[in-house]
Amino acid sequence: MSSLKHQLKTYHIPFDDQMLERLERYTALLLEWNRAHNLTGAKNSQEVEEHLIDSLYPLRFLPPFDSCADIGTGAGFPGLILAIALPKSHFDLIEPLKKRVAFLHYCVMELGLSNVSIHAKRIEALTLEAPDLITSRAVTSTQTLLSLARPLIAPHTSILFYKGERVLGEIQEEEGYTITPFKQRRYLFKQGV
């Protein structure tokens, strides 16, 4: 059993063979590109797998959704990874850095993902239809993210921000957020902003 498969089972993250194959291929692509382009700090498959599990863990509690906008996708965390896991949902990946955009396009092609659109822009310069879910990982403060995402938010839009332990200082309890802890991560979720 592969290390990734073992972790998916350990953390009760749903997967099938196609998802596992794509995640393993993504890991190889990221490590290959990372040597030349420094896309992320992950230097080996174990470190990439940590990012994969971090990206996928919310599948344990997220309600179903049809569309997602991921702000600051970077090398694919969490948007591209969630797109691999949820092929029936559409993902708009928003990333302004050209080398990361090139990598994302390459991954979409190599992995045969038809549910992904990549936007090589900053969120402030983008016009999109309001998605069901907005995600972001390690981009900026919660209030700044909400301000940047405001044009994309409709009454049906939920948010999932991948935050660190300091998230409690960024929000008020009465704002209706659910915080789910996992290792050093705090998943900040609010259904129907």
From Swiss-Prot:
SUPFAM superfamilies: S-adenosyl-L-methionine-dependent methyltransferases (SSF53335). InterPro entries: rRNA_ssu_MeTfrase_G, SAM-dependent_MTases_sf. One of its GO terms (cellular component) is cytosol. It catalyses: guanosine(527) in 16S rRNA + S-adenosyl-L-methionine = N(7)-methylguanosine(527) in 16S rRNA + S-adenosyl-L-homocysteine. GO terms for molecular function: rRNA (guanine-N7-)-methyltransferase activity. It is found in: Cytoplasm. Its main location: cytoplasm. Its EC number is 2.1.1.170. Gene3D superfamilies: Vaccinia Virus protein VP39 (3.40.50.150). S-adenosyl-L-methionine binds at residues 72, 77, 123-124, 137. Keywords: Cytoplasm, Methyltransferase, rRNA processing, S-adenosyl-L-methionine, Transferase. Pfam families: GidB. HAMAP family: 16SrRNA_methyltr_G. Specifically methylates the N7 position of guanine in position 527 of 16S rRNA. Belongs to the methyltransferase superfamily. RNA methyltransferase RsmG family. This is Ribosomal RNA small subunit methyltransferase G. It comes from Wolinella succinogenes (strain ATCC 29543 / DSM 1740 / CCUG 13145 / JCM 31913 / LMG 7466 / NCTC 11488 / FDC 602W). The gene is rsmG.
